[in-house]
């Protein structure tokens, strides 16, 4: 029920767009056990009610929920040999210590996603650094995941990746050894083609961790065709 509700909310929020500010949030949950046995919780928050600590805790919960929504069947071919990670930040973040991610790496073991610890701030350096760079250019993007790009003749298939971006309406940019090249007002997909001793990586960016999962499934399905 929670997943279905979350999916509907995510789709509705995506249609509104990332530039809208929340003025009020109202959450109503009701359980009825019998004619005279009803539990009802009705909570209203304004957009100013969340302090920084609450925002950070909410972000960590979103990361936990996001990893639970990843479909292994859709992403297993895009799993990097070194494992993947998901990172996210609060809008306006400029320090990697303020970026939340999973300590270590997320891997597939026995057909299930495995991560050793719950997400925490300052747990990532490389992925957090790329997110900070992207967020500085395109501040609406606050979430990122790293994947293995589709390969051709031992190299990242640049043509296939660009074609996928065009078909899905996503912007495309490159990074070299973790440094985004050029200046961009919009960033959706980043490709690091790799080098000697440096594994090629595909980075997907989104407005939040939940949208990131939807984009990841969409792109992995498209590239895998």
Where are these regions (language model features)?
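Conserved mixed alpha/beta catalytic, RNA-binding, or beta-rich assembly cores of soluble enzyme
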Residues: 1-15, 21-26, 32-225
